[in-house]
Amino acid sequence: MTQASLPWRHAALALAVVAVWGTNFVVIRIGLDHLPPLLFAALRFTFALLPAVFFIKRPNVPWRDLAAYGVLIGAGQFGLLYIAMTSHISPGLASLVVQSQAFFTVALAMGLTRERVKGFQYVALALAASGIAVILWRTDGSATPLGLMLVLTAGLSWAGGNIVARRSPDANMLGYVVWASLFSAPPLFALSFAFEGWPAIQHGILAADLATWAAVLWQSVGNTLFGYAVWGWLLARHPAATIAPMSLLVPVFGMAGSAIWLGEALPGWKLAAAGLVMTGLAVNVLWPRLRGRFAKVPPGADAPPAA
């Protein structure tokens, strides 16, 4: 790893990845115009797997971990997210609510690995939960209770995938995601056949236009291969404390992209809810680093000036 400060080229790369991940929610909405959600998710992971699996070495990870991650992220996170985004929640709100994964990850780590929850994490959770409550209370049709439940469950599945991935901290994440897709696509295809049916699958594929297939490829190549490859490259060269906080911008790009390209309204209550959730996320991610930084200031010395 190199210095904590990012060269501008590396910062631009990190912002590019965050922009891709955030505006990806707009791309999902475009793909869902013609494809059933489970089929769309299955195609996403099929093209993330093929042909990359023939060129990217399998990470030194147990098959059971790859299988668990593939099912949790594929069928759990994205399967449920795509279903929710058909008509139950707007792309902007989906990009925000799914960030609940950060708090579900803390809860699962506490329950499964006996990690101790810190006081600041309770504060962060309370702030984020308040934002979700605002969405439930003042929804304008851009989210239904079912949509929120589906996206929150998607966040829980994402958190489960995080816990599985943490068992292999040194694994190449791009290879991890590509090989785990081997266990994402088959169950999604099976669920699509079972719940969406062959007529809907056939109609979706035949009705899909160039924009739809571009959305599928963007999910696979842009969001998965480019995103994870560049993010992993940056994490290999800079401390995680420098790179990870930039992911807080994902819902910012998600809500802005949805407003610009899909015309999603951003009334005051929605911005307030976003502010609460984002503040909770920021406290969860940044507080330990800020506390550690200020702890290094000698007693009686002036604190560093605010930027």
Each model region followed by its residue ranges:
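Juxtamembrane helix-entry segments on the extracytoplasmic side of multipass membrane proteins
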Residues: 6-10, 33-38, 42, 59-64, ...
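Hydrophobic/aromatic residues within transmembrane alpha-helices
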Residues: 31, 40, 44, 84, ...
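Hydrophobic alpha-helical transmembrane segments of multi-pass membrane transport proteins
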Residues: 15-23, 27, 67-87, 107-108, ...
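Signature of the 12-TM Major Facilitator Superfamily
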Residues: 39-43, 65, 93-96, 119-122, ...
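Hydrophobic transmembrane alpha-helices of multi-pass small-molecule transport proteins
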Residues: 46, 52, 108, 117-137, ...
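N-terminal membrane topogenic signal
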Residues: 2-14, 120
